[in-house]
Amino acid sequence: EPAKSEDLIKWRQSAYQVLHWNMDRLKANIDSPQYNKDDGIKAANTIAAIANSGMGSLFAAGTETGKGWHPTSVKPAFFTDGKKVGEVAVAFNKEANELAKVAATGDAAAVKAQFGKVGQTCKACHDDFRRKD
């Protein structure tokens, strides 16, 4: 039996919360006086794992409206502009995978620079496909 729209929306909302948590904890680590390599690796690897998890399947037809934990904030354009969605998804995956590689080096300045690149891919998707309400 296929998953219900409500479940798909809940799962993607949950995944984005885990992503947000790891972006926040990595930023706090980068901004701290003493960068912790192990914590950076944990956060970066989690971000990369989410990027590579196949979340696109959670945006099935019928989930452009509705409620998971809260009403979905995805714009209808996400479901009609496949080319642009593909571009932002590929960019996010690429930069998230690079973040995991850079985090493994323990170079705080390099992690900070790559973190910024990941953040830009998040912003690109939010600007085009996330409602502000």
Curated annotation (Swiss-Prot):
This is Cytochrome c'. Cytochrome c' is the most widely occurring bacterial c-type cytochrome. Cytochromes c' are high-spin proteins and the heme has no sixth ligand. Their exact function is not known. GO terms for cellular component: periplasmic space. It holds the Pfam family Cytochrom_C_2. Keywords: Electron transport, Heme, Iron, Metal-binding, Transport. GO terms for biological process: electron transport chain. The keyword Signal does not apply. It comes from Rhodocyclus tenuis (Rhodospirillum tenue). Heme c binds at residues 12, 72, 122, 125-126. It comes from the Bacteria. Binds 1 heme c group covalently per subunit. One of its GO terms (molecular function) is electron transfer activity.
